[in-house]
Swiss-Prot record:
<keyword id="KW-1035">Host cytoplasm</keyword>
<comment type="subunit">
    <text>Interacts with NSP2 and NSP5.</text>
</comment>
<protein>
    <recommendedName>
        <fullName>Non-structural protein 6</fullName>
    </recommendedName>
</protein>
<comment type="similarity">
    <text>Belongs to the rotavirus A NSP6 family.</text>
</comment>
<dbReference type="GO" id="GO:0033650">
    <property type="term" value="C:host cell mitochondrion"/>
</dbReference>
<dbReference type="Pfam" id="PF04866">
    <property type="entry name" value="Rota_NS6"/>
</dbReference>
<dbReference type="InterPro" id="IPR006950">
    <property type="entry name" value="Rotavirus_NSP6"/>
</dbReference>
<keyword id="KW-1045">Host mitochondrion</keyword>
Length: 96
């Protein structure tokens, strides 16, 4: 598996994991929900990158995805196809 494939798989696992954890939480309000999503994403980024030197430089870029992830999860009501589309759009390595 080359670096591009590894990074794509990493992003997909990260966002799918975030979405699964999001569904387990109580959603009291948009603000609380987004704050919790950002905490979850921060934790997942750290867990996925802490032992992987190849992905350490991606942390800043992944953290910039937090707000976007919150927005599209809310906007599209957790639609799986939209999530996959957003992963492809977010990752510059998947553009043709």
């Amino acid at each position: 598996m080359n670096h591009r494939q590894q990074r794509q798989l990493f992003l997909e696992n990260l966002l799918v994991g975030m979405n699964c954890m999001f569904h387990q939480m109580q959603k009291r309000s948009i603000n609380t929900c987004c704050q919790n999503l950002q905490k979850i994403l921060d934790r997942l980024i750290l867990l996925q990158t802490i032992h992987s030197p190849a992905f350490r430089l991606d942390r800043m870029q992944l953290r910039q995805m937090q707000t976007l992830a919150c927005l599209w999860i809310h906007q599209h009501n957790h639609d799986h196809q939209v999530m996959l589309g957003a992963i492809k759009w977010i990752s510059p390595l998947t553009k043709q």
